[in-house]
From Swiss-Prot:
Coiled coil: none
Protein name per the record: ATP-dependent 6-phosphofructokinase 3
GO annotation (BP), single: fructose 1,6-bisphosphate metabolic process
Gene: pfkA3
Species name: Bacteroides thetaiotaomicron (strain ATCC 29148 / DSM 2079 / JCM 5827 / CCUG 10774 / NCTC 10582 / VPI-5482 / E50)
Pathway: Carbohydrate degradation; glycolysis; D-glyceraldehyde 3-phosphate and glycerone phosphate from D-glucose: step 3/4
Species classification: Bacteria, Pseudomonadati, Bacteroidota, Bacteroidia, Bacteroidales
Length: 336
């Protein structure tokens, strides 16, 4: 069997470990041939490929990014690397001409939607969920999330010392456009006093009162963790806006920090390395068993899979009854 593998959308720690898990299992256990497709779906349009061997996969486990490269090419939308052609039809033709029996797609929500469409067209597809945002429906955790939370938590830890030294409020902005999982998990792990996520409405006066109450209790500094997506009207960056409003409400010197793309870079955590390896191996097992049109998922501590059509177009969001939100409120943390 000849399988292709691609990575699409934004990069994150753990992609290379997943590629390694898929390919080493395919080559060493099942005797399959594996073809790497460069730059996501763009590579399927241009036939930009390479053959993998066991040797070529050495050293991948701890590397960030993706050895295959990635792009945001959308095969079902106009534009991109090729124009004035039926891109889905061209991809189907190229898959046949390259002799691919199956394609493994590693990506986020957009990739899952695209994979579901190709599966509906008869392409043998298996997908692996990848995002630092942890917002892919159907899996408890996506690889990349733990690494991003670790990076954000380390930054929050460092801000505690400078905030306490200057008796300031420090606002740190983390990634999460529609889902606040990174803000929630890093905010709780880093001892944030205020945690703002897109899913829970906030009130600046409530936030200001929380900070002033801390001051009355002899706590002269505060840490505020915000997800980038809490602002919906495009006024400013979330951290900048919240910092200005807090300083206006409280009169306390407030500074902001935006972590940005640093959350996507660097080596994956041990948890993500193991999760990626397991997910990659399970993807190859599905292929060997002829189970296509499915996305790998983590349920509890078990790796399973679910139909792609159940995943496409859905988001996994933070809810107010999530255990961490409930526990945070019990401890006096303000969620807005």
């Amino acid at each position: 069997m000849r399988i292709g593998i691609l990575t699409s959308g934004g990069d994150c720690p753990g992609i290379n470990a997943t590629i390694r898990g898929v390919c080493k299992t395919a080559i060493n256990h099942y005797g399959m041939e594996v073809i790497g497709i460069h730059s996501g779906f763009q590579g399927l349009l241009t036939k930009d490929i390479e053959s993998f061997t066991d040797k070529s996969l050495s050293g991948l486990l701890n590397q960030g990014g993706t050895m295959l490269g990635t792009s945001r090419e959308k095969p079902f939308k106009k534009g991109g690397v090729v124009s004035d052609v039926d891109k889905p039809a061209l991809i189907l033709q190229n898959i046949q001409e390259m002799g691919l029996d199956c394609v493994v797609c590693i990506g986020g929500n957009g990739t899952q939607k695209t994979a579901a469409k190709f599966a509906a067209m008869g392409v043998n597809i298996v997908s692996v969920p990848k995002t630092i945002d942890n917002d892919i429906w159907g899996t408890d955790i996506s690889f990349g999330f733990d690494s991003a939370v670790s990076i954000a938590t380390d930054a929050i830890d460092r801000l505690h010392s400078t905030a306490s030294s200057h008796k300031r409020v420090m606002v740190i902005e983390v990634m999460g456009h529609k889902a606040g999982w990174i803000a929630l998990y890093s905010g709780m792990a880093g001892g944030g006093d205020v945690i703002l996520v897109p899913e829970i409405p906030y009130n600046i006066k409530n936030i200001g009162n929380t900070i002033l109450e801390r001051l009355k209790k002899g706590k002269p500094y505060s840490i505020v963790v915000v997800a980038e997506g809490i602002l919906t009207d495009g006024r400013k960056r979330a951290a900048e806006y919240i910092a200005q409003e807090i300083e206006y409400e409280t009169g306390i010197e407030t500074r902001e920090t935006v972590l940005g793309y640093i959350q996507r870079g660097g080596s994956p955590t041990p948890f993500d390395r193991n999760l990626s390896t397991r997910m990659g191996g399970h993807a190859t097992e599905l292929i060997a068993n002829g189970q296509f049109g499915r996305m790998i998922a983590l349920k509890g501590d078990d790796i399973s899979s679910i139909p792609l059509e159940e995943v496409a177009g859905k988001l996994k969001l933070v809810t107010e009854d999530h255990d961490l939100v409930i526990q945070g409120r019990r401890m006096g943390i303000c969620f807005g």
